[in-house]
Amino acid sequence: MDLSVELFGIRFKNPVWVASGTFGYGVEAAEIYDISKLGAVVTKGLSLKERLGNETPRIVETPCGMLNSIGLQNPGVEKFLKEIYPKIKDVDTHFIANVFGETEEEYVEVCMALEDADKIVAYELNVSCPNVKKGGILFGHDPVILGNLVDRIKAKIKKPLLVKLSPNVTDVTEFAKVCIENGADGLVLINTLMGMKINIWKRKPDLATKTGGLSGPAILPIAVRMIYQVYEKFGDRIPIIGVGGITTWEDAMEHVMAGASAVQVGTANFYEPLAPLKVIEGIENFMKSQNIKDFKELIGIAHRVE
């Protein structure tokens, strides 16, 4: 049985990754289990300089999920390379750096700082960030701005570039198209949905920033729908990485059958640290029960079965 997938010229031992912002940089999780069993680790977001994040409270539970407004807290790319990277560089799995910035220049600088870090095999762009030079509009909410960002980064880097698309748009396929046209190597669907929770006793929003990103089981059907739509239009042109609402192997298989070549387990890591391993095991058992020898047979199969 073959669970491996080759994406953007890189072979992954299995299609189960962990999502950015839910796994730190892999150091803490490595004390709980052997993270080399994972297909890949996507790091917590990295910016050029250290960020302290938003005021608290910045996490609140909701039915079937959670809202977060962490504010992209991170040590900055140089401190990451100096203090954290040495602890992960010998782990036998791939690491993908989640990267963000407030300007095109910052995105480019962060990626360039990581070009010589061999353990980092690709970049995942978080484009749900405000462009301070364009009046604060999110990079991922304007197709022209997004296309320019992808084009500018691709011109400078050698490693594959994945773009994590926002679901908070009218037509996600429009944004997928501009990423493809400007050289993106992969698409990650989806980022969190904007939401709010109000404390009726305090008469105000629970989060200090009022709104936050909704993740967890509640967003599974939305992620599956968007993956299906993008695969339907562009599945033969670019690989899709599915993320959003994956708690079990069954959830992961919905992503895969909709068109994802690999999946990321996110929020589930907070309450079940072994969730990614259980997803891997579940996919293996499913393939055995269905007499499927190669995982790749399942990618996008929902488009081929009537």
UniProtKB/Swiss-Prot annotation:
Pathway: Pyrimidine metabolism; UMP biosynthesis via de novo pathway. Its main location: cytoplasm. Substrate binds at residues 44, 68-72, 126, 191-192. GO terms for cellular component: cytoplasm. CDD domains: DHOD_1B_like (cd04740). Its cofactor is FMN. InterPro entries: Aldolase_TIM, DHO_dehydrogenase, DHOD_1B, Dihydroorotate_DH_1, Dihydroorotate_DH_1_2, Dihydroorotate_DH_cat, Dihydroorotate_DH_CS, Dihydroorotate_DH_I. It catalyses: (S)-dihydroorotate + fumarate = orotate + succinate. PANTHER family: DIHYDROOROTATE DEHYDROGENASE (FUMARATE), DIHYDROOROTATE DEHYDROGENASE (QUINONE), MITOCHONDRIAL-RELATED. Belongs to the dihydroorotate dehydrogenase family. Type 1 subfamily. HAMAP family: DHO_dh_type1. This is Putative dihydroorotate dehydrogenase A (fumarate). The gene is pyrD.
